Amino acid sequence: MFDDNGELFFRKKERFYLEQIFMKPHPLIISLGGGTPCYFDNIDFLNLNDQVLTIFLKTSPKELAKRLYKKKDNRPMISHLKSEQQLHDYIAKHLYERLPYYLKAKKTIITDKKTIKSLVDEINLLLA
């Protein structure tokens, strides 16, 4: 979709489906990509719904680069980057630009140096 129609087309579709999901209230957990909260008024749209708990999983650029570099070929926005350092710089720049949107989340969890189990436990506490 990205390659054929570009990012804006993707973001419009993304917003359309976000709206569709919330037309039928039912319990669910949605993991959104890093750009989702930053386009249109997506973060405000999510936060206005009393049934939605937005959580910013705050991760350092170094940790994100380490995690994403192995899988970058499947991600259109970063597949062209040649080194982990280039990826780190790209992530740091985008985190800086996107941080005001991320900080609008109702809760923040710092993920660095935490196990998946401890993160799941922390999220479950927020949902309880």
What residue ranges belong to the model's regions?
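ATP-dependent small-molecule kinase phosphotransfer cores
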Residues: 1-47, 74
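Short, flexible helix/strand-to-coil boundary loops that buttress conserved ligand/catalytic motifs
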Residues: 2, 14, 22, 50, ...
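A non-catalytic, amphipathic alpha-helix used as a structural packing/dimerization or gating element
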Residues: 9-16, 93, 97-104
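Short acidic active-site motifs
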Residues: 17-20, 41, 90, 97, ...
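Short glycine-rich anion-binding loops that position phosphate/pyrophosphate groups of nucleotides
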Residues: 33-37, 60-62, 114
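Short amphipathic alpha-helical segments
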Residues: 41-44, 66-69, 121-122
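A glycine- and Lys/Arg-enriched "phosphate-lid" helix/loop adjacent to the NTP-binding pocket
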Residues: 50-97
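NTP-dependent small-molecule kinase module
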Residues: 53, 82-83, 96-128
